[in-house]
Amino acid sequence: MTNCEKDEEFVCISCVEEVRYSFVSHLSEALRRKGINNVVVDVDIDDLLFKESQAKIEKAGVSVMVLPGNCDPSEVWLDKFAKVLECQRNNKDQAVVSVLYGDSLLRDQWLSELDFRGLSRIHQSRKECSDSILVEEIVRDVYETHFYVGRIGIYSKLLEIENMVNKQPIGIRCVGIWGMPGIGKTTLAKAVFDQMSSAFDASCFIEDYDKSIHEKGLYCLLEEQLLPGNDATIMKLSSLRDRLNSKRVLVVLDDVRNALVGESFLEGFDWLGPGSLIIITSRDKQVFCLCGINQIYEVQGLNEKEARQLFLLSASIKEDMGEQNLQELSVRVINYANGNPLAISVYGRELKGKKKLSEMETAFLKLKRRPPFKIVDAFKSTYDTLSDNEKNIFLDIACFFQGENVNYVIQLLEGCGFFPHVEIDVLVDKCLVTISENRVWLHKLTQDIGREIINGETVQIERRRRLWEPWSIKYLLEYNEHKANGEPKTTFKRAQGSEEIEGLFLDTSNLRFDLQPSAFKNMLNLRLLKIYCSNPEVHPVINFPTGSLHSLPNELRLLHWENYPLKSLPQNFDPRHLVEINMPYSQLQKLWGGTKNLEMLRTIRLCHSHHLVDIDDLLKAENLEVIDLQGCTRLQNFPAAGRLLRLRVVNLSGCIKIKSVLEIPPNIEKLHLQGTGILALPVSTVKPNHRELVNFLTEIPGLSEELERLTSLLESNSSCQDLGKLICLELKDCSCLQSLPNMANLDLNVLDLSGCSSLNSIQGFPRFLKQLYLGGTAIREVPQLPQSLEILNAHGSCLRSLPNMANLEFLKVLDLSGCSELETIQGFPRNLKELYFAGTTLREVPQLPLSLEVLNAHGSDSEKLPMHYKFNNFFDLSQQVVNDFLLKTLTYVKHIPRGYTQELINKAPTFSFSAPSHTNQNATFDLQSGSSVMTRLNHSWRNTLVGFGMLVEVAFPEDYCDATDVGISCVCRWSNKEGRSCRIERKFHCWAPWQVVPKVRKDHTFVFSDVNMRPSTGEGNDPDIWAGLVVFEFFPINQQTKCLNDRFTVRRCGVRVINVATGNTSLENIALVLSLDPVEVSGYEVLRVSYDDLQEMDKVLFLYIASLFNDEDVDFVAPLIAGIDLDVSSGLKVLADVSLISVSSNGEIVMHSLQRQMGKEILHGQSMLLSDCESSMTENLSDVPKKKKKHSESRVKKVVSIPAIDEGDLWTWRKYGQKDILGSRFPRGYYRCAYKFTHGCKATKQVQRSETDSNMLAITYLSEHNHPRPTKRKALADSTRSTSSSIC
């Protein structure tokens, strides 16, 4: 071990004597338990001894300073702690961790006296945090962040291993550590060994176990590792093991690849004493099984934070290269490495020393194309242990089947003569392949290394076994015509030697070329052929100039060719090995002439082949499982498929010329016949286990009794005896159906007759019916309803009356909306939850049940308020009725009984009410004009606050019809104790998306409440959070959550607090409840009082921000207004303390609409802002350019290309957005002129790297600047002058 390595593993703790034998002793012991050596230096010793100790501090890899937070920093302490910091600045490799222990009253004094610049965050003891938790935080920080780069992300995994060990019964405990190459198995095992080895009588860590046992032998390894320093020679292996039989032994076998070799060492663990621990690391899961280890820990990759930290440390990247660009680069590297520590660190070291970001990006692209040897070697060592078949399957997946359905891959590979069920499991066990959501996945690194193995076989493209790169395939297949002596000659040299090719996948998205007629002639071993277009917006242009294809390889298992340009496949092609034919959008008229052997064919997809007329040859494919002929519009016949016993899926949808199907396959599972001309279908062959047909048929004679589901049947000639097992009968939109037989003896659960406009009567309902749909029928009266009914939907029907439903205890949903002839209802079920009868002419409504949650109507006398009330366009409702419902709503959401709060939050978080507005609701509910309202929270509500109830009055335009699309966005803003702006945004629909809402003809009032809407900054219920006001702003939105235009306005609004009540909530106390401390206050009055109490210079700063700098960065604003002697930092704090502004977490100044409005009103009402600033503003007024009218502005577009290292165009720009562009590797940045708010400049530009040359930038300028180009020195000064003058 080198001295450097020793220094890295050494930690020095500096402290005062007061904490040395208490807190610091626990910290020192905790570090030792993690295998970290440490010493403690007392700063209270005299200068001579401290000078000697200073040498230890300088050599330490990490220095921990424990500062006594409850003691005044004396000069002696400060001097010695400053020397500790000086050691760190002299030794750049040393890290310093600071701890402020004790009360934090003197924290600021310590921080001001010592210079902590460039150091990590300071750990501080807290009242709510015990010393043990603080020690745990410090140890983790030292262990991962500072101790040594290789252990980043190890700490949490180490705790999981410890937990796995501790859960095992006393005896010999075993743990297997499993993971892909480079994931950190060895590092984790070393960390476990360092931490636990001191607790055992003997321990050994055998690195690269297979190699070690091969070189030294089993006997020497045991003696050397477990009995070090033993002078006597032990002649027998049994004697050596006898000496260890009574000892607690820790054995770590690292990177075991041969399970038999590992098992020979352990031999059933009989020779180990009780309490011993065996740890094996391996990338092959079968090793653990054969070694008898059942507890297996799978090592996961680093999370995003850990991965970024490791990358920046490995690359020695400094933040001065630009934080945004560094963020983008590190994210790309991390995403590519997918948390693999080896890959992240190797890529980081490869990028180390690159000074320019463009150099780093270029180097990274090269590394992706050609992975570093260290990474390739780590993965290839696993690849070399595979059998030939396993290697072929791995390479097929790496090159062709990433993300494909595992059953699809297995089917193709079985056709190739492999045994993929077994061999894919082997690849999974060796961490080369994963199966997730029934799809096959490879780590991006693993895929690229697999492809690198292919490319490394030979430099000749035609000699490679698998091809996937479009440019190389084009080179091999392209038709080249040269004219010599007036005669065309075609060269085929490129195709020679291509006998080795087994797979060819060509993406034609960006290609345009002609294929050789004999392109595939020499590819005798080609198994997999796929020519496709990954971009659906691009039409591929690949043709045969001679109009023919001479041959296809007879070894093909997969033939996937989209937009195949010829009328048939080559006649000499023998498809006996084909497993799948997938040729959508082809020009095929028929597959081939004559009879072919199709015994291996499982799937054929010829969808949207509009010229296809003949598929009779498919009858020869006796093992066929899927036929997809969707959209084959010229296909007239579908052959009798009764002998295709394995056929499961047939899709003939869109085959408009097919009029009949002679036979249905006996084992059919899905039959798609939408858009066909089929009028009749024989179902006598349908088996009991295939119970679903998806079709659009007009007649099915002779329904089988096993059939359980039919969709869109128009006529049924079957008797009820044939429908004994039918459970779902959907006759939706069967407009010709006039009657149905008595169905009382059927076992139907669902009966859908909606849209059967000619059906005017029904004789009886099935006794077990649960769902009944009668919407749009002509039925006027219905027989007795079954007691099992759960849903009754008669929307828009001709019903005049209903039987008494009081005994239907299972009925939950009743929809009678639009039943214009319905006059009376005798009673409602007691468990009813949803009731809709808007648009009816009911004379009398019975008592509503207490269980009701949703009501879309009016007239409830229930004391139990539903969750949703809708009184849309009920203008005849009296004002008192509307006010009563509003009061009920507010009462229900304002006071929630104690003990039920959490249940309501989980089960019923929202409530709503809507009704036409009345003019004097303002007086009743203290509504404020406008779309904003300020709320002051009573101190007593802080511990009982649940959420808010909101009243919003919306004005609708007269010609607006689709009110269903309208919703309200509520933005709640407040300031935390640090003056930072916090916000919650929730969106409420005025009407549910499925509700049919007529044209709204008047302003409506909506009540929304959400008990999940509770302001919080993640800091608990700290009272300082509520020191200011809470502001609510409301915006009309559509279903896409976009703001509606000015024709939709929020006229008035108000807010109520929802809290946990402790008293009676009955309606008799409603007046008392609402008279408690009014929640709404006059926003303008509160703001004006706060403004009037400001100092004059703070008033000026507020007016500047209100006029110019809302939503701008503090760092941007400060230099612009520094020229008029305003103290920005202290002024912003003053404004934030009185709730006139807020500062967001990313440093933006935030004002809500009420604050901006008041500022502008004050500004316009004053003839001067401040006498001290009058001369400055008047002097600069002439510098402000006059604004041009909008209609005279011209939008100018100019595109230029410049090198990425160019200094720019000398204009001052601010970036305001960035987004990924479809089909481009690089994102596009959006910039606006920095003088937009001072000069009204409309100039913008868009910047994107060139696709052909990443070192070039394509810049698109939109509109011209309306001011002179500033010099570098004058840019900021000009901005300041124009800002100060434009406020006047």
Swiss-Prot record:
Q: Where is this region: Disordered?
A: 1267-1288
Q: Which SMART domains does UniProt cross-reference here?
A: WRKY (SM00774)
User: What are the ranges of the LRR repeats?
Assistant: 498-522, 535-553, 554-575, 577-598, 621-646, 665-688, 697-720, 740-764, 766-791, 792-807, 808-829, 830-852
Give any GO molecular function from the UniProt entry: ATP binding
Q: Enumerate the residues binding ATP.
A: G179, M180, P181, G182, I183, G184, K185, T186
Residue numbers covered by motif Nuclear localization signal = 986-1003
Presence of keyword Ligase: no
Annotated GO CC locations: cytoplasm; nucleus
- Database matches in PANTHER family: DISEASE RESISTANCE PROTEIN, LEUCINE-RICH REPEAT-CONTAINING PROTEIN
Biological role? Transcription factor. Interacts specifically with the W box (5'-(T)TGAC[CT]-3'), a frequently occurring elicitor-responsive cis-acting element. Also acts as a disease resistance protein involved in resistance to fungal and bacterial pathogens, including R.solanacearum, P.syringae pv. tomato and C.higginsianum. Heterodimerization with RPS4 is required to form a functional complex to recognize AvrRps4 and PopP2. Contributes to temperature-conditioned RPS4 auto-immunity.
Miscellaneous comment in the UniProt entry for this protein: Ecotypes susceptible to C.higginsianum or R.solanacearum, such as cv. Columbia, contain a protein with a premature stop codon, while the longer allele found in cv. Nd-1, cv. Wassilewskija or cv. RLD confers resistance.
Name by which UniProt lists this protein: Disease resistance protein RRS1
Q: Which gene encodes it?
A: RRS1
